[in-house]
Structure formats: C-alpha cells, structure tokens
Amino acid sequence: MKRVIFCIVALLLLLGNSAVAAVLKVKTPKRVEISSQAVKPYIVTIQCKAEAVKVSASEQWLGIVGEATLEAKATHSVKIWAEPNLSTTERTAEIELRGVKSGAVRTIIVSQPPYLQSITDGFPVRMMGSRYDAESWESCGICSPKGSSAVIAMVGTSGNALTTTSEKGLTVSGMGAGDYFLFAVPAENIKAGEQIDFMCTMTASEADAPKYWIFEYWDAGRWNGIESELRTAQQDSSIRYSLYNKRFRSAHNTTYAQSFTLTEPIDNGCVKVRLRALTAGSGKVKLTGSSKYISLQILRYKDAPKVSDTRRMLFIGNSFTYFYGTPFMFKEIARSQGHQVDVVASVKGGQEFCEHLQLERSIEAIVRGGYDYAFLQDTSPNAAIYADTHDPAIIASCRKINDLTLKHSPACQIIYEHTWGCPYGDYRGYGSYERLEQLLESGAKQLAKELSEYNIIVSPIGKGFTIGREQNLPLLHTDNRHQSREGAYMKACINYLTVYRTPFTESVSNCGVSPKTAKIIRQIAEQVVLGR
C-alpha cells in the first residue's frame, strides 16, 4: 500500500510540474510577422509576471538584440532581427521564452514572407562603378545590382539605428559589432564541391567606421569562416579578422578576394556570403562605386577542371592595375585553367614604388608574406623615364620594394610589368606611340638587368598592347590612358602566361569580354609570351 501511495504522489508531482510548464506567466503575442527585408529590428512586448525569462530564437536567420534574460515583474520591449528571406516561400521560426526557475516554456511564432519571386540563376555577378539600385538601398537597405538577380542587403543584429545611403556606392552609418553586409546570388543547381570566388572593394568614408571585418559563407546549415586566412589584430589578440577597413588621410580602398568551396549542393536557392563587422563604428563605410573599380564580383566555376596547384600572389600597383580589376581577372583565368590563386592586392591611383613604401596598406600586404609571386607595377612612365634619364631615385625605389618583398617572402618570384603606351600628355611627353613604347620596353629590361641579383621577370604587357593597337583592338579606356576591359584582359592573359608558360585550353574564361575579342587577345598574349 505504501508503495502505491508513493507512486501516486510521484505522479501528482510530475503532473504538477507539467502544469507549471504549460502556464508560464508571461504576456506576449502568439504570432508576429516581419517584413521580407527585415532591415530594422522588430519590437515584441513581453510582460514577465512571476519570474525571469530567458529568450532565444530557433533559427540562425533570426536573433535577439541585447540581453537574453528578462527580469521578473517587468514589461520589456524586446528587439528581434532577421535576415531577408531570400527564397520564394514563406518561412517560420520560434522565439522561445523559458522561465529561469521553473523551466516552463512558451513560444512566439515568427513568420516572414519571401523576398524573391522566382529563382533565376544570377552568376556571374560583375559590378563596376556604381551600377546599384540606389533608391531601393536608401529606402530599405536591400537592393540588386542593376541588370542582376543578385541581392545585397544590410543586416542589423546590434540593434543600432542604421542609415543606408548611396554615395558613389552603398553606404551604411551607425554599424555595431555583428552587423553585416549580406550578398546572395540565386542559383538553380550548384553541386557539392563547386568553387565560388568572392571579390569586392570596400572603403571607410569616415575615421570612425568599423575597422575589422570577417568573411563568412553559408554552407551545411551554418556560417563558416576560413580559419587559415584569419589574422590577429595587433591591439587586441581576441580579434581574428579577414580584412580591415580604415580611413586614411588619402583614401586607400580595401581590395578583398576569397575563394570557398561548398560541401552541400544548392538547388533553387542562393549562394550566400557576408562581411561581418567585428568592431563597432558610427562612421560611414561603403561598398565603393568609384569609377572602374571592381565593386563586387561573385563567380562560380561550374565546368572548371580540378585544382592542380595553389599559389599565393601579391599585386602592388596603381590605376593601371585596378581598372577593371586585373588581379581578379588573373585569378579567374587561372582557376578556369585548373590553378588556384590566392590574391592579395594593394592598389592606389598614381602611386610609384617610393610612395607604396610609405603606405600602411601596401606595407601590410607585403609584410604579410608567404607569396609565390609578386607583381610589382611602378607608375607607368617610370620605366620610360629611366631609359631616358637613368634617374637613380627610380632604381633605388625598386631595390627597396624588392628587398622588403623578399624579406617576408624569400622564395618569391618578383615580376615587373612592362606597361603600355598611350596618347595621354602628348604620349607622356615623348611625342609618339613608337618613341614611348620603345622607351617603356627598354626601360623595363634595363631595370631587370641592373637588378639582376633579384632575378626579376618582366611581363611584356606593352608588347601585347602594341600588337593589339595595330589590329585596332579597343584596349584603352575612353580617357586614352587607362586600360579598357579588353585591355585589362590583355594584361591578365600576359601575366598568366608569364607565370604558367602553357597555352590556354578551351575552358579559359573570357572575363566578361566578348568571346571573339577575347580569343584574339589570347592569341596575341601567346604570341608575345610563348612565341606562338
């Protein structure tokens, strides 16, 4: 009999606990709906009566701003954030409220309608300049590049009041740690193991913009970083970052490129990437829209051969490097041929070697080290000036940048770029294409010869431009000075062949150049470098 009574008491206690769990004393809405963009935090009023309550979200696209524990006997305005719903169907999640003492639970259903009407494959994404849907960005912090089905969004997880404006790019003010730029590209069928390349240019418009950022991509149900590529902040060893963005006295953009491979397939979904702020900053930060910079590029390598080797390459240069993103074109061409290239670039308009040696970002890029190749491009006329005057300051700067490069990358092969002639400034003051081109070529060769202890290779880009000009190829931009997209492709092809020394295969990428013109450019590049 005692045993029966004991069992009955135990059962009553169990039922009592269940009853407590069923009647958590809070007052909340049963269901909330947030917008498909969800740029601003949504406020949910929660009244805690008898005990403190812990708040959590059931899905990674949804989160709680600030403290996760609410005090008892108080009314709270809880902010929740959500990513845009980049799918074609409504989705739901739960906000769980759990009593700290009782363990009793109540849930709030959160629903979110879709942002996309349909999935239309958005690869490749190639953004130059400021071709964004600025009106959409300014109104709701989410937009698509013009002519693309890709999506760019601002996601605020910190609860800060974010301001989105368009000022020669996509600008955000007031970011807190954890807020992020989200990039998504609709994809109809991506197989497991397929590689994606992400490339962008970011700049700090004000001194107090967030400095440290981490790159992450969505795969296997979570956000993934690339641990091997992370660096440690000097002033705070707890900060492990992918890139840093800083306002310099003279603007110097952050140029970033990263490859990643998906372990799970995507069928009628989106490839998602984010740049997440690790430190807060009220100042303006933007995805640049400066003329002829790569603003954003996201590529997939659907039919590319497997990677046969991986090499790390440094690009130091000026506008003759950054117009149309020649380092990124090099990376794209190499991957289409089965070579993986990890790119680090420091590019700033008009810079000579001596000026790069005074730039924090250029020094940081060189000192990072571990490079297999370094493409060093002095300001374009310097080779011609050296051939004409033998200015000792030019060769002295060459020695200094070579020494710094090899100090941190002892096995690195240094490559100088023999650049091209142009009509600008009466052919740089030399009066004709022929005279300028002759000086540029002889000057590059003289520098390499007089610096023979460095075993420098000269990439004969200027020779390719000369042949292309004779064939009326549009290799110059409308300013008759910088490279056009076709000129950038010529430069990238010649640089590629200078490294790999093998002809192009049929799978080579055109990098956005028309197939017919791209083929002619490749033939010229092979003629110049390989003698074919």
Task: Describe these PLM feature segments.
Residues 309, 482, 486, 492-532:
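Conserved catalytic region of serine esterases and O-acyltransferases that act on ester linkages
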Residues 23, 48-79, 222:
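Surface-exposed binding patches on compact interaction domains or structured appendages
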Residues 178, 187-199, 204, 208-210, ...:
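Extended extracellular/luminal ectodomain segments enriched in beta-structured repeat modules
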Residues 312-314, 320-399:
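Conserved SGNH/GDSL esterase-like catalytic core that processes O-acyl groups on lipids
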Residues 88-101, 285:
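A short beta-strand micro-motif common to beta-rich folds, especially ectodomain repeats
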Residues 207, 223, 235-304:
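Terminal, low-complexity interaction segments
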Residues 365-485, 497:
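Alpha-helical cap/lid subdomain in secreted, periplasmic
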Residues 145-192:
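Surface-exposed, low-complexity/disordered Ser/Thr/Gly/Pro/Asn-rich loops and linkers
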